[in-house]
Structure formats: C-alpha cells, structure tokens
Regions:
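Cytochrome P450
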Residues: 2-280
Length: 280
C-alpha cells in the first residue's frame, strides 16, 4: 500500500513511508519521479524493510552525501557485502552469498581495494581505449549487421539487438573470452544478477543453475592462463601480485565475474538508458 501511494503522487508523499525494496515500485521500470522527489528532499531515508533479519538499510540519494560515504570507509565499510542476502534463493548446502561476494573487489575496503583496482585500472584508461578503437568498431559493425539481417526494415531493438551484445563482446574480448560466447555470457550474468526480475528469471532455482554453469567456464579460462598466459586481462589478473602475494584462485574467479558483470550489465544499462534519455 505504501508503494501504491508513491506511484500515484510521489511529489507529495512522505519519504519515510517508502520501501525502496518493494518490487512493485520497480514493476514498470525505474521510478524516476520518486528519485527526483527524494533528491529534492535532500535527506537520507530509512527503508521499511520486510526483512527483519536485515534490519533495513539507508538510502543515500544526493551527490554530497554519496561522495562523503565513498570517502569514509571506516564508517561505511564494504566488508559486509553489497547484497540483501535474504533476497537470494537458498539451497541446502549452497555457499553463503556473503562469503562468495567477499572475494570480490567491491567488498573490500582501502587500502586493499585500491591495490586491487590498480590491477585493472590501466586497461580502462583513455590511451587503452584508443588502442581498442578499431576492434570495438569492428564489433559494433558486426552487431549492427546482424541486427539488420534480423530486421530488414531497419527497425531494431536497441537493448535486445545492440545493447546486449556490444558491451559483452568488448569486455569479453578484453578478458579473453571468444566473441561467439557473448550471448551465453549475457545470459549467465542476467540470471545471476537479475534474479528478482521475472523477465529474466522465472524459477529461482535457475539462478543457481546459472552459477553452476558460469563458474566452470571461468575456472577453465583461469586455469589455462595460470600455465599458459596470454596478453588478455584475465592473464594479467592471474599473474599479478597484491601486497606481495598472488590472488587466490577463488579471488581471480570472482574478479572475472565482477568485470564481466560491470562491463556487460552496467555498461549496457548506461548505454541504453542514456540513449533513451537523449531520445526523450
């Protein structure tokens, strides 16, 4: 009921009555009117969580506060992980989600976070982007050609036909994954990160199935590069040292997963949402 009130009139709603974890709020896409209202209030608000074991959480909605939180890792640590654990499907004997995520860079605080970030930061500088320009142009042309073959009238779906594939093929190639695996990588990352979206996942058991399929794929790539390094980003991570030590095999696996999700899902969302905003 609280969410319905916000949908009807977010401009006059009380921010303390909003539960941003209520899936109904997101049913028709991001609730931009609600976001604007929250930013105009210039405050933090406490979510009315339906998950008592989690105790609710704070939403930070304006730039100044977000910047302050980002600079203060002692007060706002990332070690607890970034997920609402109770929202994940549970299976007997399944690994603890927090334990898994704590092998990822985004669940680390400085100074280790900064050292892990430095391992890959050089691969995403403007200079490196220029060096990849021709390969990215080749990928974009390939994706557009395929989209036009699928839609001879020239009316393509920007998300399904373009946004799904360009970021996945670019980051996949940087990591050393074959281009032909792009669709499978998109499917795995969708199912493991969008487990509450009924358009992506209809059966929660399918989330764990995706993990069981994805991890052996990554494990094979990492194992191969441990003995036969190439010039891709996965090899660089495998053979890098942080604090004088190599990353563990599990840390490398989760690094690959993180980069694949960030380079695929996050980039796709920014690209397609940005295009929609420009068109609107």
């Amino acid at each position: 009921p609280r969410t319905k009130d916000f949908e009807m009139n977010p401009a006059t709603a009380d921010p303390t009555e909003l539960d941003v974890s209520d899936l109904d709020l997101w049913r028709d896409g991001p609730p931009h009117e609600v976001f604007r209202m929250l930013r105009s209030q210039d405050l933090h608000f406490s979510e009315l969580s339906d998950f008592p074991d989690e105790g609710g959480f704070w939403s930070v909605v304006n730039y100044e506060d977000i910047a302050a939180v980002g600079r203060d890792h002692e007060t706002f640590s990332s070690k607890r992980s970034i997920i609402l654990v109770d929202r994940l499907p549970a299976e007997p004997g399944a690994p603890d989600p927090i334990d898994i995520s704590q092998n990822m860079m985004i669940s680390q605080d400085p100074p280790r976070h900064d050292r892990l970030k430095a391992l890959v930061q050089r691969a995403f500088t403007p200079k490196m982007a220029v060096e990849h320009t021709e390969r990215m142009r080749e990928i974009i042309n390939l994706v557009y050609d395929r989209a036009l073959e699928k839609h001879p009238d020239g009316r393509v779906d920007l998300v399904q036909d373009v946004g799904y594939f360009v970021p996945a093929m670019v980051i996949g190639e940087m990591l050393g994954a074959p281009r032909e695996d792009a669709a499978q990588l998109v499917d795995w990352t969708n199912r493991t990160t969008a487990f509450e979206d009924p358009r992506m996942v209809t059966d929660l058991d399918d989330v764990w199935k995706a993990v069981e399929e994805f991890m052996p794929y990554v494990n094979d790539m990492v194992t191969e590069r441990e003995t036969n390094p190439t010039d891709d980003l996965t090899s660089a991570i495998v053979h890098a040292e942080v604090d004088g030590e190599r990353l563990t095999h599990e840390e490398v696996l989760m690094f690959f997963f993180l980069l694949m999700v960030a380079g695929n899902d996050s980039t796709r969302s920014v690209f397609t949402s940005g295009m929609k905003s420009l068109m609107d």
